């Protein structure tokens, strides 16, 4: 199973693709990883357009069975939520155009799936990603580590039969 994971952000969007191997213990290979960067000085339409184009290009290249995104929770940061929504919209349109279903997972679900408990630190989750992917070091920067964790989380829930598309 090939899964694209996305940590949505308008300035830094984590984008990772993994190939999950067989059954049994969760093991996977890293196929692609990057952080798509945009500048706050650019017009919004250019930032969103660049994110959309890059995500669509990766989806066409790797042909994942699913796109998994991190659900965002903003309590008092309305402007940040608004701008992250731009990035998420670009991802949703790219997934639609590529014909790939989209799934969303919250931070607690990611921690539970990869570390076995919902209160794991980011570093603990990154180390689990490193182990599952067989990497020498934990993925960096954090946006990439989060994107890969989200992709692996989808693989975990898909194996359990509990994954539901947006």
From Swiss-Prot:
What's the family?
A: Belongs to the RuvC family.
Q: What is this protein called?
A: Crossover junction endodeoxyribonuclease RuvC
Entry keyword Magnesium: yes
Cofactor note text: Binds 2 Mg(2+) ion per subunit.
Changing residue 146 to N has the effect of:
Loss of HJ resolution
Q: What information about domains appears in the record's comments?
A: The wedge motif stacks with DNA close to the Holliday junction point; Arg-76 interacts with and eventually disrupts the T:A base pair cleavage site, and subsequent to cleavage may prevent their reannealment.
Name of the gene this protein is made from:
ruvC
Self-association state and partner proteins as the record states: Homodimer which binds Holliday junction (HJ) DNA. The HJ becomes 2-fold symmetrical on binding to RuvC with unstacked arms; it has a different conformation from HJ DNA in complex with RuvA. In the full resolvosome a probable DNA-RuvA(4)-RuvB(12)-RuvC(2) complex forms which resolves the HJ.
What catalytic activity is recorded? Endonucleolytic cleavage at a junction such as a reciprocal single-stranded crossover between two homologous DNA duplexes (Holliday junction)
Q: Where in the cell is it found?
A: Cytoplasm
Residues binding DNA, per UniProt: 10-11, 40, 47, 73-74, 76-77, 80, 83, 108, 140
One MF term in the entry's GO annotations: magnesium ion binding
Documented EC number(s): 3.1.21.10
Outcome of substituting residue 70 to Q: Loss of HJ resolution
Q: Does the keyword DNA repair belong to this entry?
A: yes
Alphabetically, which GO biological process terms does the record hold? DNA recombination; DNA repair
Q: According to the UniProt record, what happens if one changes residue 143 to A?
A: About wild-type HJ resolution
Q: Give the binding site residues for Mg(2+) 2.
A: 70
Question: Which positions in this protein are listed as binding Mg(2+) 1?
Answer: 7, 143
Top-rank taxon, per record: Bacteria
Assigned keywords, A-Z: Cytoplasm, DNA damage, DNA recombination, DNA repair, DNA-binding, Endonuclease, Hydrolase, Magnesium, Metal-binding, Nuclease
- Tell me where it mainly resides: cytoplasm
The active-site annotation reads 7, 70, 143, 146
Q: Thermal dependence of activity in this record? A: Optimum temperature is 58 degrees Celsius.
Motif (Wedge) positions are 74-76
Q: What does this protein do?
A: The RuvA-RuvB-RuvC complex processes Holliday junction (HJ) DNA during genetic recombination and DNA repair. Endonuclease that resolves Holliday junction (HJ) intermediates. Cleaves cruciform DNA by making single-stranded nicks across the HJ at symmetrical positions within the homologous arms, yielding a 5'-phosphate and a 3'-hydroxyl group; requires a central core of homology in the junction. The cleavage reactions can be uncoupled; the presence of a 5'-phosphate in a half-cut site is required for second strand cleavage. The consensus cleavage sequence is 5'-(A/T)TT(C/G)-3'.
Q: What is the effect of changing residue 73 to A?
A: About 50% HJ resolution activity
């Amino acid at each position: 199973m090939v899964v694209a994971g996305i940590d949505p952000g308008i300035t830094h969007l984590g984008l990772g693709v993994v190939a999950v191997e067989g059954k049994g213990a969760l093991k996977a290979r890293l196929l692609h990883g990057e952080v798509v960067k945009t500048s706050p000085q650019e017009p919004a339409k250019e930032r969103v357009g660049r994110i959309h184009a890059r995500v669509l290009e990766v989806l066409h290249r790797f042909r994942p069975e699913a796109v998994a995104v991190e659900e965002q929770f903003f309590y008092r940061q309305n402007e940040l939520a608004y701008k992250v929504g731009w990035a998420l919209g670009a991802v949703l349109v790219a997934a639609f155009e590529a014909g790939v279903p989209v799934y969303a997972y919250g931070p607690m679900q990611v921690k539970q799936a990869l570390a076995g408990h919902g209160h794991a630190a980011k570093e603990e989750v990154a180390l689990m990603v490193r182990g599952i992917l067989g990497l020498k070091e934990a993925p960096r920067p954090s946006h990439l580590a989060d994107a890969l964790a989200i992709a692996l989380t989808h693989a975990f829930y898909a194996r359990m039969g509990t994954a539901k598309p947006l």
